[in-house]
Amino acid sequence: MTKLLMINAHPHTTVPSASLTVAASFKTAYQQTHPHDEITTRDLYQDGVPALNDTTFEAWRKRKYGEELTSVEAELLSRHASWLAEFLAADKIVFVNPMYNHFLPAELKQYLDLTAVARKTFKYTVNGPVGLLPDKHVLHIQAAGGYYHQPDQHNQVEAGDPYLRGMMQLYGIQDYRTIFIEGLDQFPEQREQAITAAQVAAEKLAGEF
């Protein structure tokens, strides 16, 4: 069974989210065109990304030298392993997020740190790193208040999508697609039009993804 993993990296607010709205349209259309696929949604804000902190590094050190872990350390490493296994098991992955200060939300960056594991998602060779996940497919849905992916619209200050694309390339993933919902704050009168256009694009892409 084909597995689709949706990574929601958007805080829960009372203001409707453009990226989550478009992602919902994609999911509905995908379910209709892929009725037998398994869809899992991972909410980074609600679930809490397993930490990469002092406790993590101490637990790794203890495990390396065969020392006994505390219950907190064991639970943390168990969550790391579980989340990584979920990522590895997915055939298709959809990242959904707003753009924060020309980059990704911190929770999504932390998730990428969690999945960047040598000998799992990539390996080191004498010729440099080689990705281990060439058969996966990725879609990135991102919303922004301004324009960053139009001709002459400050493309150089948008670092989030290029970073995500680069990480997927590190993992060996070449099929990487994007849907950008932009200009939402710069031209608020065109907000609904921009969201609707992105929903149409998402529904179309869902059928072939």
UniProtKB/Swiss-Prot annotation:
Cofactor note: Binds 1 FMN per subunit.
Description of how the protein assembles with itself and partners: Homodimer.
Record field: catalytic activity: 2 a quinone + NADH + H(+) = 2 a 1,4-benzosemiquinone + NAD(+); N,N-dimethyl-1,4-phenylenediamine + anthranilate + 2 NAD(+) = 2-(4-dimethylaminophenyl)diazenylbenzoate + 2 NADH + 2 H(+)
Binding residues for FMN: 17-19
Matches recorded under HAMAP family: Azoreductase_type1
Organism, scientific name: Lactiplantibacillus plantarum (strain ATCC BAA-793 / NCIMB 8826 / WCFS1)
Pfam families attached to this UniProt entry: Flavodoxin_2
Entry similarity comment: Belongs to the azoreductase type 1 family.
EC number: 1.6.5.-, 1.7.1.17
Keywords recorded for this protein, A-Z: Flavoprotein, FMN, NAD, Oxidoreductase
Gene Ontology molecular function, alphabetical: electron transfer activity; FMN binding; oxidoreductase activity, acting on NAD(P)H as acceptor; oxidoreductase activity, acting on NAD(P)H, quinone or similar compound as acceptor
Cited InterPro entries: Flavodoxin_fold, Flavoprotein-like_sf, FMN-dep_NADH:Q_OxRdtase_AzoR1, NADH:quinone_OxRdtase_FMN_depd
Protein's name in the database: FMN-dependent NADH:quinone oxidoreductase 2
Job of this protein: Quinone reductase that provides resistance to thiol-specific stress caused by electrophilic quinones.
Cofactors named for this entry: FMN
